[in-house]
Every structure is written in C-alpha cells, then in structure tokens.
Amino acid sequence: MTSVPGDEFVVSVSNLNQRYRNTIALDDVSLAIPSRRMIGMIGPDGVGKSTLLSIVAGVRHLQSGQATVLGGNIADTGFRNSVASRIAYLPQGLGKNLYPTLSVLENVDFFGRLFGQSAEERAFRIDDLLRSTDLEP
C-alpha cells in the first residue's frame, strides 16, 4: 500500500500470527492503514477479522509479529494504556448489549458517560463520528 505524501499510518501490522489451540486465526498478516481513511473488513466467519481488530485495539495480546497503532507499539502496556481512550472497538456480539429503547446517539452518549467523558467531550466526539462516517443528519 502506498501512502499519500504527508499521511501517517494509524495502524501498521506486520507478520502477525495468532493461534487458538490448533486453529490458525492469523497467518503472517501484514497491513498498513493511512490516517484519514475509513476501511471495512469483509470476509466469512473464522478468517481472523475479529482477532486482528482485537489486537489493533489492544484488547488481545499478540503472539508474534508487530503492531504499531497511533505511532506506538500496542504490545507495550504503558503505551496501550495511554492510547486506550482514543481507540473505539465494539467486539462481535457486543452489539446485543446495546439498549434497544435508546437511539444510536443515546447509546453512544451513554457509553461515553460510563467512560467518564464530560458532556462537552461526548458532544464533540459524537459530532466528529457523524461527520467522519457521513452519517450527520
């Protein structure tokens, strides 16, 4: 993948390998995502999408390979803790835990409150998400 001059990679992984007992989830995966890009990961069940995303989000320790996220090594506990609040990750199945009586905006706002964000911070982040995903009303 070539980058546009001035772009930084927000995610860069190389030679990732991950196993669950006898099942290979990731086999020598390398990927670079430039900043200011929206991507989608599409594929059948069991090909490693959730495993890759959980490593990038820092919720799963990588077994081998390298993962650089937001300019640092996501395997480093100190770095991971320092950027955790800047990474949004909704694991597969967790969507069942959203509140059906709340709108999407109300659900996002609710979880922002759980993480201690001020009303101003939540409003800023929600507005930013809506703009960056072209979902603004």
Functional labels for PLM-detected ranges:
Residues M1-N17:
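ABC-family P-loop ATPase nucleotide-binding domain
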Residues T23-I24, N81:
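Short coil-to-beta microelement around the adenine-binding A-loop and adjacent beta1/P-loop entry
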Residues I42-P44:
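The feature captures the beta-strand-to-loop junction immediately N-terminal to the Walker
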Residues A57:
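Helix-to-loop junction immediately C-terminal to a conserved catalytic motif
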Residues Q66-S82, Y89:
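ABC ATPase NBD Q-loop/coupling interface
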Residues T101-S103:
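Ser/Thr at beta->alpha junctions that act as helix N-caps
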Residues D109, R113, E120-P137:
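Conserved ABC ATPase "signature" region
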